Swiss-Prot record:
It catalyses: 4-CDP-2-C-methyl-D-erythritol 2-phosphate = 2-C-methyl-D-erythritol 2,4-cyclic diphosphate + CMP. A divalent metal cation binds at D14, H16, H48. Keywords: Isoprene biosynthesis, Lyase, Metal-binding. It comes from the Bacteria. Gene3D superfamilies: 2-C-methyl-D-erythritol 2,4-cyclodiphosphate synthase (3.30.1330.50). This is 2-C-methyl-D-erythritol 2,4-cyclodiphosphate synthase. Homotrimer. It comes from Corynebacterium glutamicum (strain ATCC 13032 / DSM 20300 / JCM 1318 / BCRC 11384 / CCUG 27702 / LMG 3730 / NBRC 12168 / NCIMB 10025 / NRRL B-2784 / 534). GO terms for biological process: isopentenyl diphosphate biosynthetic process, methylerythritol 4-phosphate pathway; terpenoid biosynthetic process. PROSITE patterns: ISPF (PS01350). HAMAP family: IspF. One of its GO terms (molecular function) is metal ion binding.
Length: 160
């Protein structure tokens, strides 16, 4: 009798303050004419939340332990690069990515017109389905006041 494949689920949140003049990277896409988010990296809250959820699901730590803020080689690193590296890390530990889902929380950018493009880009990077959505908080809180953006993500992985 073989052991059943048991999926592992991870969840994560990421948030960054908006920084005037910084390029806006969301879900591995550049949004022209919109201020981006501050951070040690590119400030892509969606990519970062997905990376963190994948690490959570696999039990391999979290975003802070994965890249840290004191490592100069990650200064300005893109969400795309982080997703590639976490996929390689999971694979090296025998994990397969089942799927990921993430939601962007913020007033800007208008995400709907590029949602499918972002899903395709992230799916290609991680080698698994990706579902994305976006919402506002009806002008409540730091995201509602356009002081920052946040993202919540879930990921499903299993041992190969």
């Amino acid at each position: 009798m073989t052991n059943p494949i048991i999926p592992r689920v991870g969840i994560a949140t990421d948030a960054h303050q908006i920084e005037a003049g910084k390029p806006c990277w969301i879900a591995c896409l550049l949004f022209e004419g919109v201020d981006g988010c501050e951070g040690h990296s590119d400030g892509d809250v969606v990519a970062h939340a997905i990376v963190d959820a994948l690490l959570s699901a696999s039990g391999l730590g979290d975003l802070g332990s994965f890249v840290g803020v004191g490592r100069p080689e990650y200064d300005g690193v893109s969400g795309t690069q982080l997703l590639k590296e976490v996929r390689e890390l999971l694979s090296a530990h025998g994990y397969v990515i089942g799927n990921v889902a993430a939601q962007l929380v913020g007033q800007t950018p208008k995400f709907g017109p590029r949602r499918e493009e972002a899903q395709q880009v992230i799916s290609e990077i991680i080698g698994a389905p990706c579902s994305l959505s976006a919402t506002t908080t009806d002008h409540m809180g730091f995201t509602g006041r356009s002081e920052g953006r946040a993202s919540v993500a879930t990921a499903v992985v299993w041992k190969a």
